[in-house]
């Protein structure tokens, strides 16, 4: 499971600066969730080979009263759910009462914590950082987040204990990043193997949208004995089930928790828990409340799923009991605001009464099969050639862009790598045309498809040709002949 790093500290110590630097390293999707909290941000980051979720917390002013306020609860929740806490302080301002208060709270939680003395640029860092040892949280790490000094070393040190686990996880997900070039027979055999694997389904949505109701409806219909292994208080519940001969694992993010161990605010909605579920899933089922329409939180969650490249099914819940005028308005809003994901199936359901729930699994299975389908190199190259025959690539500087061959570059989501000359100069309109052509030809439904173009560089370009011995002799005779003619 991908580790979570929480940035904790009093206001203006550089949490947001570090957050922005970390998330920029991978063009990561960064989303604020209006209505959830105004001072907590989430992003995916990649640095020095480590992939992780980073959380920018806020709202802790360090006072005893401030720790207990509603405003601070979401930040405290981030600490509870994090694997690693970076406790950030201001080396220029020195140790404050707020720092001491936050440190006391962190010690009581017994979290893996690293004290970071930020803003060390232009000062005597060793001298300025000495007093932070009194926080009682171990070694003090020096950093200048704005300039990037010390950031990489800090992350490498903090995430080293997770390196082996992440390596094992990547091996376990080998089928999702498989770049082998299959023959027709190999692709068919691999596809058959994948049919026997359980489909991991994450059910996500904003608070009170009906996640628990839908989960219970699904399990009740199938009469499956549910077992859970909660582990720590931040783990989602994995529920195995079978439907129509196909095995599934439902990743429940609805908030099944040991209530005595966590804040009530965590029960309702945990973005971190949702992010982890999305990362671990094959297919994401996003639930939208029909009575509220498409909210900003829905778009934020949708962005997380798309950023992770997961197959997607959308369920509009609470469809029963609303009049036709509202239904027409909701459908119009879905077309307008979700037009960019026209590949995803949309279902209108009632989780409470079971209306339309059964049809969800047809789309879930369809999306999984599309996302994990193995396609041979010869098939992809044929489709690429047909797309060119139907619509020639444009001319660039008087020369036609030439596409040579295509092969698979990964799965979940499907990635097609196309090799050719001058492909970097292809206009976006032609790339979209090709993407849609591949989608129609492969009948890809419920998952984004990505095209990557690689330039077929001339291996002899800028290379001095080495002559053979016979060529060298002919060259000398020719030069001698030219020289003799000039002297006559």
UniProtKB/Swiss-Prot annotation:
Keyword Translocase found: no
Ranges for domain EngA-type G: 3-166, 199-372
Entry's Gene Ontology BP terms: ribosome biogenesis
Binding site for GTP 2: 205-212, 252-256, 317-320
Molecular function terms, GO-annotated: GTP binding; ribosome binding
Residues that coordinate or bind GTP 1: 9-16, 56-60, 118-121
PROSITE patterns referenced in this protein's UniProt entry, alphabetically: G_ENGA
Ranges for domain KH-like: 373-457
CDD domains: EngA1, EngA2
Pfam families: KH_dom-like (PF14714), MMR_HSR1 (PF01926)
Keyword terms, alphabetized: GTP-binding, Nucleotide-binding, Repeat, Ribosome biogenesis
Subunit comment: Associates with the 50S ribosomal subunit.
Physiological role: GTPase that plays an essential role in the late steps of ribosome biogenesis.
Family, as annotated: Belongs to the TRAFAC class TrmE-Era-EngA-EngB-Septin-like GTPase superfamily. EngA (Der) GTPase family.
Name of the protein this chain belongs to: GTPase Der
Name of the encoding gene: der
